[in-house]
């Protein structure tokens, strides 16, 4: 089972990481990873960043059927 230290180490290694990526990397359930990230945020060790993807490089995101889902991405990083 993944612990707070493994989450912290993965963030240190990879920089900005989505919770789903951490979940897959650590083979831990996504709700568990999200809860641990929230705990690390409360401890002042991690920050949550909402990235705006509206400036798509190809310019085709507005017509993309997946466009609504990827309008913003939440990533986490160490403080």
From Swiss-Prot:
It comes from the Bacteria. Disulfide bonds: none annotated. Keywords: DNA-binding, Iron, Iron-sulfur, Metal-binding, Repressor, Transcription, Transcription regulation. One of its GO terms (molecular function) is DNA binding. It holds the Pfam family FeoC. InterPro entries: FeoC, Tscrpt_reg_HTH_FeoC, WH-like_DNA-bd_sf, WH_DNA-bd_sf. The keyword Cell cycle does not apply. Iron-sulfur cluster binds at residues 56, 61, 64, 70. The keyword GTP-binding does not apply. Belongs to the FeoC family. May function as a transcriptional regulator that controls feoABC expression. This is Probable [Fe-S]-dependent transcriptional repressor. It comes from Serratia proteamaculans (strain 568).
């Amino acid at each position: 089972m993944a612990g707070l230290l493994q989450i912290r180490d993965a963030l240190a290694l990879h920089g900005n990481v989505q919770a789903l990526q951490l979940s897959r990397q650590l083979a831990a359930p996504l709700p568990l990873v999200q809860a641990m990230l929230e705990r690390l945020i409360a401890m002042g060790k991690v920050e949550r960043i909402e990235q705006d993807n509206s400036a798509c490089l190809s310019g085709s995101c507005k017509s993309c059927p997946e466009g609504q889902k990827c309008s913003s991405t939440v990533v986490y990083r160490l403080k």
